[in-house]
Amino acid sequence: NNVTIIVMITNLLENGRKKCDQYWPHDGREQYKHISVTLRDVDIYANYIVRSFQLRNTKLSKRRSRNNERRILQYHYTQWPDHGTPEYILPLLKFIRISSVVSSPESGPIVV
């Protein structure tokens, strides 16, 4: 589906319990079966983090498919409380605007 943007609004832990699996490497590269995920860049802001990944399908040779690599941007909102909704809406609205304007017409849907 040519997805290039992932929006994450939960943290990995909630009240000390695992809420979401970390599907990206802390640094460097990790292999998940035939998909290689390389963390390229991390930008930390007050209410969110932007991570850039390079995904590579190692099952496909470069000669067989020129589409075996893809750049993914992950927008991770870090201020969602463990219970309820955010107290202040403006940081969340800014996050939604920033994460949605980066999508290009060639991109697939934004995955939330």
From Swiss-Prot:
Substrate binds at D82. Its EC number is 3.1.3.48. SUPFAM superfamilies: (Phosphotyrosine protein) phosphatases II. PROSITE patterns: TYR_PHOSPHATASE_PTP. Keywords: Hydrolase, Protein phosphatase. Coiled coil: none annotated. Pfam families: Y_phosphatase (PF00102). It catalyses: O-phospho-L-tyrosyl-[protein] + H2O = L-tyrosyl-[protein] + phosphate. The keyword Disulfide bond does not apply. Belongs to the protein-tyrosine phosphatase family. This is Tyrosine-protein phosphatase 7. It comes from Styela plicata.
